[in-house]
């Protein structure tokens, strides 16, 4: 029997640095279960994207994204382009995609044992992905696509590199509340155009965002629909 090959690509900074330790633990656990594992700890987001493209092009049994939703999003772009199986090892702050898929918030020996078994059995499940055309560029998403207040908060939080974890999002939210105004949106759904002002618009493949907020509670990542 051929030994399956799994590639772990981890964002070593995700989850306040926890993703690095989780990835090392995953490598050890999967290797002990008879999986040939290659671990990458890229130093930057651009390096992560380059490694993702290279790893997915080699068509291993699975490419495992270890980190938060941003890490999963970046690796997804490469995996879906060449139809490579993508797995998720939760290691970020929010882990909303993993949460929407029913994965545990904290990894354990049992989690890695089940993962190794799935890799050996070549077991995977098909899930939905959203395709977005942005300035002529095609982008894929597994979670919630949104615009408005939440996006403004996220953009502000990303600029607060001096703050860590969820605290910076709380600070960004309070700062954005002071100056945010509603915007006019035109949305076409099933051929019907809607125009209105809104604080935010969210389109969900998965139901969670923002670290567990159920913005689209009826969303199902396997029903072929966006909510």
Description of each model-found segment:
Residues 1-63, 73, 110-117:
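ATP/NTP phosphate-donor binding region
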Residues 199-227:
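Internal helical hairpin/lid segments
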Residues 12, 66-68, 89-92, 205:
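Glycine-rich beta-strand-to-loop/alpha-helix junction loops that act as flexible
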Residues 71-84:
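Short Gly/Thr/Asp-enriched flexible loops that form oxyanion-binding sites at enzyme active sites
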Residues 33, 81-85, 91-199:
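Catalytic core of DAGKc-family lipid kinases
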Residues 43-47, 67-70, 92, 148:
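Short beta->alpha linker loops
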């Amino acid at each position: 029997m051929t030994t399956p090959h799994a590639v772990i690509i981890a964002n070593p900074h995700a989850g306040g640095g926890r993703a690095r330790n989780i990835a090392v633990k995953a490598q050890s656990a999967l290797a002990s279960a008879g999986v040939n594992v290659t671990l990458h700890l890229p130093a930057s987001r651009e390096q992560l994207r380059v490694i993702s493209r290279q790893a997915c092009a080699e068509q291993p049994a699975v490419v495992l994204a270890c980190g938060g939703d941003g890490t999963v999003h970046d690796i997804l772009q490469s995996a879906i382009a060449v139809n490579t199986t993508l797995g998720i090892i939760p290691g970020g702050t929010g882990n909303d995609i993993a949460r929407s898929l029913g994965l545990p918030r904290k990894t354990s020996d049992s989690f890695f044992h089940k993962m190794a078994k799935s890799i050996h059995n070549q077991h995977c499940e098909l899930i939905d992905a959203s395709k977005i055309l942005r300035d002529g560029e095609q982008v894929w998403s597994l979670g919630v696509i949104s615009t408005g207040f939440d996006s403004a908060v996220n953009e502000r939080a990303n600029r607060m590199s001096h703050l860590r974890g969820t605290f910076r999002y709380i600070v960004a939210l309070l700062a954005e509340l002071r100056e945010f105004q509603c915007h006019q949106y035109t949305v076409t759904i099933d051929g019907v155009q809607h125009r209105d002002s809104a604080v935010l618009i969210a389109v969900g493949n998965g139901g969670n965002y923002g670290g567990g907020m159920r913005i689209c509670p009826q969303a199902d990542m396997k029903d072929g629909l966006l909510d």
